[in-house]
């Protein structure tokens, strides 16, 4: 939409790094998510989308995500437990006012698991890295959490108030090579980038998100999902 104003706060995703940890930037112009219980139909629609856009755009990545067990990732922890619900989700995800009210910022990343290294940890150590119990998905009490736990370093707080995002992560890959596609929505892009910066950057005590010792980020891009009213207005 070259004649439309840029959504407030929309930024290109910039690569991040600290020590031997990195989040690469792999920009894209358009992200399409197809959701269906019929893999064959989703694939058919995807094929025609690629053909339809072929004169003006190249498909640079095509991932098939899937639900794994009881909404677990492929390191076998439940993913998305702390997602906001109901009206809290609406407040966390949707831009509240202005031209793009009802739209949302979207961050996409692909992570590949370093499974052998992860499997070498004891279950207790794995739970320390994640900040939740593995089998029954119970959050470890704050006083007992490791300062490098994933749910500590990825949490965004401003003046003591947690700023939520909504995740629709999906397991991806094969038995040989697999991981997670991070799909994060937020009312402000800064919520998403702040979370990543806290994860990857070691604090004054040297703590960063230790989950990054067991996964490798391979892609990263920021998008904006416009509200339906905006799409209706420009298409007439």
Predicted regions, residues:
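Long, histidine/aromatic-enriched segments associated with O2/redox biology
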Residues: 1-236
